[in-house]
UniProtKB/Swiss-Prot annotation:
Keyword Cell inner membrane listed: no
Subcellular location, principal: secreted
Protein name as annotated: Long neurotoxin 1
Cellular component GO terms, alphabetical: extracellular region
Tissue: Expressed by the venom gland.
InterPro entries, sorted: Snake_3FTx, Snake_toxin-like_sf, Snake_toxin_con_site, Toxin_cobra-type
Entry keywords, A to Z: Acetylcholine receptor inhibiting toxin, Disulfide bond, Ion channel impairing toxin, Neurotoxin, Postsynaptic neurotoxin, Secreted, Signal, Toxin
Family per record: Belongs to the three-finger toxin family. Long-chain subfamily. Type II alpha-neurotoxin sub-subfamily.
Cystine pairings recorded for this chain: 24-42, 35-63, 48-52, 67-78, 79-84
Localization per record: Secreted
Signal sequence region: 1-21
GO molecular function terms attached to this record: acetylcholine receptor inhibitor activity; ion channel regulator activity; toxin activity
Keyword Transport listed: no
Organism: Tropidechis carinatus
Length: 93
């Protein structure tokens, strides 16, 4: 019985620790950072602003509890694994 209880305690601690380790790439620094508890999605949001033709699309990366809602003229994608939202310019081709 004590072995079973000890096993359950160890499994609980491991699971709680893993729950806090979800990470996504975040802007403006485009580096992997831990997400807040409950935020288990990474998102990438891109759009054109007044300077789109000279510098390219604006890119926002971050964590979310739910995928951000659609917005006019903005592309939004979400994924649910660690660091699954790399900056498009940093992806291997």
């Amino acid at each position: 019985m004590k072995t079973l209880l000890l096993t359950l305690v160890v499994v609980t601690i491991v699971c709680l620790d893993l729950g806090n380790s979800f990470s996504c790439y975040k802007t403006p620094h485009v580096k992997s950072e831990p997400c807040a508890p409950g935020q288990n999605l990474c998102y990438t949001k891109t759009w054109c602003d007044a300077f789109c033709f000279s510098r390219g699309r604006v890119i926002e990366l971050g964590c979310a509890a739910t995928c951000p809602p659609a917005e006019p003229k903005k592309d939004i994608s979400c994924c649910s694994t660690d660091n699954c939202n790399p900056h498009p310019a940093h992806q291997s081709r």
